[in-house]
Amino acid sequence: MSNTIQIALLLTFVFVVNAQAQSPEIPASPIPEPAAVPTARPAANPVQRPERDTTRTRPVVPADSPEVTERLRRFRENTIDPNAPQSTRVPVTKSASMRPARLYCPPHGPLEINIRRGDAGESLTLMLIDRNGEVLGMAKDVQGRVNLLEVISGIDSLEHAAWLQLVQGDHPLGTPIVIQPIREPPPVRTTRATRPNSTATFTKIIGWGDRPLDADDPTIDEERKTWIAGDPPIISGFKTYTDMDVLIRTDHGEILVALAPDEAPSTAWNFRTLARDGFYDQSGFHRVVPADREGKPFVIQGGDPTLTGNGGPGFALALEPSTLPHEYGVISMARADEPHSAGSQFFFALGREGTARLDGQYCSFGYAVSGSRAVDSIAATPIADIAEGRPANIPVILTMQLVTAPARMPGIDRRQDRIKTTTKVGEVAPTSR
């Protein structure tokens, strides 16, 4: 072998060794520590890290890694795994369907969705429907990738979230898509007030922006003179996402909640996200007040993983000006005296008589469409501490999960499906356990 060939082979060997030494291994995703729980529960089976498959060019991704968790979430929510082989993919349906192209869209577009025509030959129509069932706009004979700003006029000036429904003939198809304009809420106007039959004071909300909550209240006129004008509202973009209900499984039965992004978009999205990601699992209803001091139906409150009434998600939400009335079955955010202090704790109203005074003071963001027996059963839980509303045995929230919402129908307000109570104040609710 010539000296030239020997030198070339030696240099090649040195280059390969150096290249291998400088290539870091892909670190394995750590298994998270189990979260602390307020009550003793059986320890879960430890997660077994899969062994490395030496036939692969990359390490096997651990089953608990963020990559796999996100893939499974998308599979559950969209009913299709984009990374699965073509032969094993599960179709959403054989009929027509639609999906958002992305979650966030810029204010001037494109605002796109993907429409699958399906097997039927009849043309498809898109309807933009508000919460009252009024059709705000429509586009006919649509399919493929559609820019909504080009086919539905007025969508760029939406003030509240609306629902995009796919229709074939006279039949709505599948789950609607929420079209939510991203707007900052107007500044909240407050004053110090005294609670009825008490000397205690609290922060009372009296208006939003330049609009008072009670235009007939003469005391607000002086307050309005001190209000500093906020920035004019603008649309910073859009959120587009599949409409989902939240199924709350408790040891008293199930409660199905329809969200109201048209009233409180950020609050509804926060609750949906915490529910989807398991924040509420194994928490409970730590405060049960079936009736207030005047005997009027009041609230059941939950959403605190510590079950103390002081826990939360580690952040606070800006209060939103929801006008959804606090009626039986309506879900709203609990908070401290500071208006922008809500996080994860929520409550269900038990009756208009006792909770009408909460309108405008607390942010209602949805309503139960099934589960009145469970709500009434929780409200009938024996109380150990009446002053605090502390139950003797805290009703447990086993899990929460997202389920696809039903189609939106023109001319129909889904709030008509809100649950009705099965009992009267003072009666014992029939348990659904």
Predicted features along the sequence, with ranges:
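Bacterial N-terminal signal peptides
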Residues: 6-16
